[in-house]
Each structure stands twice: as C-alpha cells, then as structure tokens.
C-alpha cells in the first residue's frame, strides 16, 4: 500500500454543467468575502458545483473549507450509479434540492464497488477482491482497512496447483472460541467474500481524525470484529457465548461505546477502548428469535430505539419489499420495549447507512414521523444483484408507504444507500490506498 494525500475537489471531480452566465455580469468578480459567506449557507453538493465554476470561485471554495464554515447539518442524499454516466461516477440525489450531482470517485470504479455503509461523510465500500475501502466523495480521500484474511474465521484458499484461489469461511465454535473442526468451510471467490464479510460496517468517528474504530458485522452467525484505522488485522469480539446473531450496531459519542442488537432484541454495550473488548448486557429481551431485521438507533435525546423491519415478496416473488416497520423505545428502567408512533417531528433514515434522525423543521421536504428505507438485505442482494431495489418512506401514523426517487437512469448495482456529504475535519489527510 502507498501513502497519498487527499486531493481537493477540482473540475474533473464534479461532472455537472455550470449554468449559463447572465449577459453583462461577470460573476467571477464577485467579492471573495461575500462569496465565502454564501458558500457557508449552501448544501455540500451545491458547494461542489460552485467550487468548479472558475478559478476565483474555486479559491473561495477552498477558503470556506479551511475556515470550516460549510454546513455541519447536511441534507440527505441517495447515492447510486447512473447508466448514463461513466462507471467511475457516483450520482448523489439530494432530497433537499431534488437535484442530481455527479462525483468522479478514485479507483476502483464506483460501479464495481459494493456499498456496505456510510457515516461521517464517508462511503464504506468493498471492492471486487472483497477489500474494505473507506472513501470521502468530497475530498477524494480513501483509506484501506485490514485485508479480509485477517478476520478470525477467514483464510485465503489455494487450489490444487498452489495458486491463490479465493477465501475459505469457517464456522466458529462459540463455546471454545475457535474454529469448528467438524464443519467444512464455505468456499468463496474473491468477489463473493464481500457479501459474507460486511453485513454491516460502522465508524466511531471521521476516519481522517486519526482516532476511528471500524466495526464489522460478518458471517457466519453474525459475528462482530473491529479494527482501528491504520491497524493490520481485525479483532473478533468473543467475550462470551452470546457474541453472535447480531443484526445492527451503532456508536455513541457520549460514552464512547458501541451498542449492538441481537436477533431476539437483546442489546449489548461493547467497549473497545482498552486492550481487550468488554461487553455488558444493556437489555435482556427474553424474546425468542423473531423473523425480521432489527436496527438499533440513538435518538437526539439520547434514548436507545429499536426498529423492526418485516418483509414480504410481491410481483410473483420477484421483488422484496418492506411490509411493515415498528419503532420501539428501549425502557432501560423497566427493561422492556415501548412501541412509538411518534418520533417527535423527525424523519429516520435506515439501510446500509449508520441510521440517523433529521428534524423535519430543518428539512421541510421530508415527511414527519416517517422512516426512509433502502435495501440492505445481503442474501437478497447477493441472489438478485441487478433486481429491484426498494427506496421508500414508511409513515408511522397510518402505516403507509411512499416510493421515492424515480428510477430513471438509476442502476440497482451497487445498491443505493443514504449518505450525508461532509468534508473531513482535517484539511490534509494521509491515507492508505491499494497500489
């Protein structure tokens, strides 16, 4: 791997035509201090556009970034690949403006990547060799995480001629915390591995901060492993026999802990700050396994919430859609779940992204008390890579759905995901990229 510095956004990075100029006006002569103040009020995708109009505007754009006055409450975007664009270009559809923005990503081409997460303005992707790459579309910074073969239950496989041939995925015995010698490993190609290694990926912080821990939820049996940016291997969380069957993870900045939800609704708090991970049971749900996807979310007031997502198949079993969503508050005093129909004027975004709330009063184009969803079911995506992809809003008050974002040129691979653009906190970042 080689060390490179992140590049600034230039005309080559944003492929959007500038609007025609007004006769008699030279907008390049707009005073820099006024332009910088204007840039501070714009959504980040619009700042992309402004920064490539001309040299003087680009200089003001760089100064606005340096001063840190760009929006710290960016609106939501749907990121996807468009059939009428180059494979390296990512489309950002802003729900705030209704516009599409086009950003050329660093190699490997965006259309070959599998989006497995988004957080802190970074997309979390896996390439065709199943390597995990963190990339910031705004700064073009890219960071490579430890290779898949350093995950506890993954080994590189050789064929009969001794040539590297893919991955072997082993079952782990939770009682012995070791390989299950009686179970045959699953043979995976280089590309197939990413569907098994990254069911969920969560960041503790902006990766450019130098203090970011990355948590992955992986098969078999929905295990958790973590690594810090710059580390060489993944550490398996195997504190006890309960460390499996996880569905989702979040990071809480306030107490610097990860919170993970299991298939039966149990919630575990996980401390990765010391030499060895420490686990504490926050909620013992005492439920049997319920057949739905479960998300764990932190509200603005600091409450832990669970979202249970039920699916069904439609159109002759060709399309998998959400049938219902139920939101619960975790009552840590009574140790029970309390159903919510009102999320207090917010909209909630779930999918491969780290779940987040937005105040509808700040983004009036959103619908209050609604859950905005994208597809994130790995086995369905694996078996139907170019099939239907759900992008919808579920309205809690009347249990109805609204389909979002007309398909147009939108492709279903990589799977569309929610994303909030952001600039790295550091203006210059040293990051690892694959050579």
Positions of the model-derived regions?
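CRL adaptor-proximal regions
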Residues: 1-30, 37, 162, 434-435
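C-terminal closing repeat unit and adjoining cap/tail of repeat-based domains
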Residues: 3-5, 318-435
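Tryptophan-centric aromatic hotspots in well-structured domains and transmembrane helices
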Residues: 26-27, 32, 76-78, 121-122, ...
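Short helix-loop-helix/strand-helix junction enriched in hydrophobic and basic residues
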Residues: 32, 46-66, 93
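Beta-strand-rich domains and repeat architectures in extracellular enzymes and scaffolds
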Residues: 62-88, 107-121
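Structural motif
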Residues: 85-91, 130-133, 222-225, 265-270, ...
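Surface-exposed loop/turn elements that mediate protein-protein interactions on large endomembrane-trafficking
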Residues: 89-105, 134-151, 225-237, 268-282, ...
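A sequence/structural signal of beta-propeller blade repeats
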Residues: 108-315
């Amino acid at each position: 791997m080689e060390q490179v510095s992140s590049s600034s956004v230039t005309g080559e990075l944003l492929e959007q035509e500038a609007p025609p100029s007004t006769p008699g006006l030279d907008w390049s002569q707009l005073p820099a201090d006024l332009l910088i103040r204007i840039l501070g009020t714009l959504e980040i995708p619009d700042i992309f556009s402004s920064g490539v109009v001309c040299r003087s505007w680009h200089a003001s754009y760089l100064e606005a970034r340096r001063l840190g006055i760009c929006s710290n409450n960016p609106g939501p975007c749907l990121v996807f690949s468009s059939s009428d664009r180059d494979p390296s270009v990512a489309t950002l559809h802003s729900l705030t403006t209704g516009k599409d923005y086009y950003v050329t990503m660093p190699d490997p081409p965006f259309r070959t990547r599998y989006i497995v997460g988004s957080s802190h303005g970074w997309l979390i992707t896996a390439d065709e060799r199943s390597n995990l790459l963190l990339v910031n579309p705004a700064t073009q910074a890219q960071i490579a995480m430890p290779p898949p073969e350093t995950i506890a239950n993954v080994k590189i496989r050789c064929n009969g001629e001794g040539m590297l041939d893919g991955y072997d995925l082993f079952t782990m015995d939770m009682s012995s915390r070791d390989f299950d010698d009686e179970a045959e490993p699953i043979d995976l190609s280089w590309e197939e591995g990413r569907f098994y290694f990254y069911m969920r990926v969560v960041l503790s912080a902006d990766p450019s901060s130098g203090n970011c821990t990355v948590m992955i939820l992986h098969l078999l049996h929905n295990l958790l492993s973590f690594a810090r940016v710059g580390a060489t291997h993944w550490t398996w969380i195997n504190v006890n026999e309960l460390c499996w069957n996880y569905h989702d993870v979040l990071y809480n900045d306030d107490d610097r802990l990860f919170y993970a939800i299991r298939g039966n609704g149990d919630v575990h708090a996980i401390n990765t700050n010391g030499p060895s991970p420490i686990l504490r049971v926050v909620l013992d749900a005492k439920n049997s396994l319920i057949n739905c996807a479960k998300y764990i979310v932190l509200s603005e007031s600091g409450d832990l919430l669970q979202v249970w997502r039920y699916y069904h198949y439609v159109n002759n079993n060709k399309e998998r859609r959400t049938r219902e969503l139920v939101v619960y508050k975790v009552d840590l005093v009574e140790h029970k779940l309390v159903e919510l129909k009102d999320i207090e004027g917010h909209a909630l975004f779930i999918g491969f992204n780290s779940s987040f709330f937005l105040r509808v009063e700040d983004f009036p184009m959103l619908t209050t008390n609604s859950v905005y969803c994208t597809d994130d079911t790995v086995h369905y995506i694996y078996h139907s890579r170019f099939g239907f992809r759900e992008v919808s809003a579920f309205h809690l008050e009347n249990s109805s759905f609204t389909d979002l974002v007309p398909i147009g040129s939108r492709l279903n691979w990589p799977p569309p995901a929610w994303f909030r653009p952001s600039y790295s906190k550091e203006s210059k970042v040293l990051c690892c990229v694959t050579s």
